[in-house]
Amino acid sequence: MSRKATIERVTKETQIKLSLEIDGTGEAKICTSVPFLDHMLDLFARHGLFNLQVDATGDIDIDFHHTVEDIGIVLGQALKEALGDKKGIRRYGQATVPMDETLASVAVDISGRPYLVYHVSLPKVKIGEFDVELVREFFQAVVNNLGANIHVNVMYGDNVHHIVEACFKAFARAVDQATQVDSRIQGVMSTKGKL
């Protein structure tokens, strides 16, 4: 079973092509014109062992908002498509990741019900030119388009780069765990018989 998807999204604001292979080796080829987002997506692929290719252009002369949000939309859609009927997946994943002085935890339930809990206090508003409020927008877009319940919690941290990086690494590891196929699971991991 090949769990792959390629999604293209073209609007007046962005042009995005994203290819994802869930059962990958962590290979990434990322070009979004948003360097900090490139770094986070590279981390997501590596720490989740997903193969990920993203080619994106957007109206970054205005700001990064549309590009970041739309990549979140497309990543959520790609995960959903690649998972298909979700038969045999563990459904739940959780990871806690330290990054120097920071500790971040992400829990994922690929339930079909989108809901984001985001308890992340960021000590400043920008990392270089990147508005850190866009991290929440990215996760919200993934949640809405994957149909998942995702809780992002930072227990403590001072360095904003470390905080965001720990969140993305924990997110990758939690999604990897939730998407793993377990041969003991018959159908889907739900008493309803459907996710």
UniProtKB/Swiss-Prot annotation:
Residues in the signal sequence: none
Q: Which SUPFAM superfamilies match?
A: Ribosomal protein S5 domain 2-like
Q: Which reaction does it catalyse?
A: D-erythro-1-(imidazol-4-yl)glycerol 3-phosphate = 3-(imidazol-4-yl)-2-oxopropyl phosphate + H2O
Provide a GO CC annotation, any one: cytoplasm
The record's subcellular location field reads: Cytoplasm
One Pfam match: IGPD
One GO-annotated biological process of the protein: L-histidine biosynthetic process
Pathway field of the UniProt record reads: Amino-acid biosynthesis; L-histidine biosynthesis; L-histidine from 5-phospho-alpha-D-ribose 1-diphosphate: step 6/9
Top EC class, one word: lyase
PROSITE patterns registered for this protein in UniProt: IGP_DEHYDRATASE_1, IGP_DEHYDRATASE_2
Q: Give the EC number.
A: 4.2.1.19
PANTHER family recorded for this chain?
Answer: IMIDAZOLEGLYCEROL-PHOSPHATE DEHYDRATASE, IMIDAZOLEGLYCEROL-PHOSPHATE DEHYDRATASE HIS7
UniProt name for this protein: Imidazoleglycerol-phosphate dehydratase
